[in-house]
Amino acid sequence: MPRLSQWFVRMALIHLALGFTFGALMLSNKGVPFYPLLWRLLPAHIEFLLLGWTLQLALGVAFWIMPRFWEAPARGNETGAWVAFVLLNLGVWAVAIAGVFALPAAVTFVGRVLEVGAAVAFAIHIWPRVVPRTG
């Protein structure tokens, strides 16, 4: 597995653990209320599981399994994929922190722009590798 895929999967697992933990805390607080402000974790819970876990795992596996080029470097210039990794994680954390601490909407907007930038950067990187392999 390439190093970038390892990092995507590791970060996805970290986001899964955080999202699961936040969800468990909110669920237990719903059954036995002990700290009302735990509901502020809901945006982070959603962000960590939908984009931090699901999307990041998909991108890491896609980088790994998509067809490689016949010549070196086999996966092409990886810079775009690394940029996607950094932008996605910055975006996920910006949106999560903005929701938890009730920061201005501009912080959430910046986080979403970073996430879109990650999608564009990854798409640009992976596009040349979307080819049929016959024979």
Language model region names:
Residues 1-135:
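Hydrophobic alpha-helical transmembrane segments of multi-pass integral membrane proteins
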